[in-house]
Regions:
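Carbohydrate transferase catalytic cores enriched for Leloir-type hexosyltransferases
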Residues: 1-372
Length: 372
């Protein structure tokens, strides 16, 4: 098959949507090399991570000479897909071009409907644009991929997408999270980032929906002799300032460690050295940091809402994300129970096999083949 991909997020996004795009294309190249992969992007972002990604793959990149690059991605790409004899075009992050050619089969991945569930966090104009793009893509796609049963449920309830048109295909995480860092690597990483000996870990964007402030408030309520430092890997703007103001006002600077910029290759060791991974998000399409933690052998505390129980499995610890008291109790009780933590991480490592790279990639290839 000649498979085309919307690769803008692959080259320019280094969190959830970009990771999904890179992992799928990388896995297709590794496990199904007989297929020809075509990456369509208005331009390429020249960074260490994109260079490493491109040098490791067999692929073709297609760009436009049109100065209106966003116009090409939304309206002008169709004729290029026909020219390149693309069999399947996959919109990896919610979008398919308008004027899509009938000669080409189409798949779109919908990660979440966050802007519909939390409209107060988005500008009115942005919501209208997103809704137009999402509904158009769901309408014209030959198949809609939802990354969780929770997202499938939202698509049916909010956009009335026919259930039979939706396929739930989970995502995997990068292979490096399954590789155990040796003691020397862990210690070098600890020194490099000035990490405490024992710590709690949060990885993700620092935005309101991710709920970092409630973690900090819960830690603040724990008696000082039981408090464990929190390492935060991620960046943010206004909400991050709000969190940092709370930390400053309550004298918690020595307990909360922010790592805004890290080398991606160091992230597995940071997960592996953590006592617990904490992710009490209010809503996720899937929650890839949860399976990164499980693959790394780190026990997880996460929310009992949206897709997070799908990602965390039966042996992660679940809390009401709005209950600071529940989170406080978990952060007090779990670190003190080493036997339970050991059971959690062993069962978590077994559960995360559900998201095996080859398995989920095979499911996607089978979906592509079913459309031809």
């Amino acid at each position: 098959m000649n498979i085309g991909f919307d690769a803008k997020r692959l080259f320019f996004n280094f969190t959830g949507l970009g990771n999904y795009s890179r992992d799928l294309v990388r896995n297709l190249n590794a496990f199904f090399p007989e297929h020809s992969l075509h990456l369509y992007s208005p331009k390429i972002n020249d960074t260490d991570r994109t260079r490493e990604f491109l040098y490791s793959l067999t692929y073709q990149v297609h760009r436009t000479k049109n100065p209106l690059k966003s116009y090409w991605r939304t309206f002008g790409m169709g004729k290029d897909l026909v020219r390149d004899q693309i069999d399947i075009y996959h919109g990896l992050s919610h979008e398919l071009p308008f004027n899509f050619p009938k000669e080409v089969k189409s798949v779109v991945t919908i990660h979440d409907l966050i802007f519909e569930k939390f409209p107060q966090q988005y500008a009115w104009a942005d919501r209208q644009i997103y809704r137009k793009k999402f509904t158009h893509s769901c309408e014209i796609a030959d198949r809609v991929v939802a990354i969780s049963e929770a997202t499938k449920k939202d698509l049916i309830e909010i956009y009335q997408v026919p259930e039979e048109k939706i396929s739930v295909i989970y995502q995997s995480c990068a292979e490096i999270f399954y590789e155990k860092a040796d003691e020397e690597t862990q210690e070098k990483t600890r020194i490099k980032y000035k990490l405490p000996k024992d710590y709690l870990l949060y990885v993700g964007s620092i935005i309101e929906r991710k709920n970092l402030l409630n973690i900090v408030k819960a830690i603040h309520l724990i008696p000082p002799d039981q408090q464990m430092p929190l390492v935060v890997v991620g960046e943010g703007k206004k909400y991050a300032d709000k969190v940092k103001n709370y930390i400053h006002q309550n004298g918690l600077e020595n307990l909360i460690h922010f790592l805004a910029q890290i080398d991606f290759a160091d992230l597995p060791a940071i997960y592996q050295m953590a006592t617990l991974f904490i992710y009490p998000s209010l809503y996720e399409g899937f929650g890839i940091p949860v399976i990164e933690a499980l693959a790394s052998g780190t026990p997880v505390i996460t929310s009992s809402v949206s897709s997070l129980p799908e990602a965390g499995g039966p042996d992660s610890h679940y809390v009401d994300p709005n209950s600071i008291e529940e989170l406080k109790k978990a952060l007090e009780d779990l670190p003190a129970n080493q036997a339970h933590l050991t059971s959690m991480y062993k069962k978590g490592e077994d559960y995360v096999k559900k998201f095996d790279r080859e398995k989920v990639t095979r499911e996607m290839v089978e979906l592509y083949e079913s459309l031809l």
